[in-house]
Amino acid sequence: MVHFTTEEKAAVASLWAKVNVEVVGGESLARLLIVYPWTQRFFDSFGNLYSESAIMGNPKVKAHGRKVLNSFGNAIEHMDDLKGTFADLSELHCDKLHVDPENFRLLGNMILIVLATHFSKEFTPQMQASWQKLTNAVANALAHKYH
């Protein structure tokens, strides 16, 4: 289990309060699909994913990105029980969707990049470390059913 300090929790929560979930979520998922094109196979129903501009403008990518980032909001509220918080999603991604758990880490990295882009002044090394710890912990929680 990952332990978050009071300072780490406060840092994550302070930035989260400023996040536009739709924008950051959509951009994060779009970046994942562009930079790691093999991840597109999990989104066959999303339609046109044939170019960077098609992915960035795809409403299904934006909607699912928002959904993914909303789950991070849930994580922030339950930082002391991430495995329990993500148990159902872990089971879904493992047993039904068969998503390679490495993709969770890759998406976490995309979220960090987008946050750093949108909040460059607030995204200090300490902030980045707190968010990196959270995205890694969420990735591990999502991969829990794989073990």
UniProtKB/Swiss-Prot annotation:
Keywords: Heme, Iron, Metal-binding, Oxygen transport, Transport. One of its GO terms (biological process) is hydrogen peroxide catabolic process. Gene3D superfamilies: Globins (1.10.490.10). GO terms for molecular function: heme binding; hemoglobin alpha binding; metal ion binding; oxygen binding; oxygen carrier activity. One of its GO terms (cellular component) is haptoglobin-hemoglobin complex. Red blood cells. CDD domains: Hb-beta-like. Heme b binds at H64, H93. It holds the Pfam family Globin. InterPro entries: Globin, Globin-like_sf, Globin/Proto, Hemoglobin_b, Hemoglobin_oxygen_transport. Residues 3-147 form the Globin domain. Hemoglobin epsilon chain is a beta-type chain found in early embryos. Belongs to the globin family. This is Hemoglobin subunit epsilon-4.
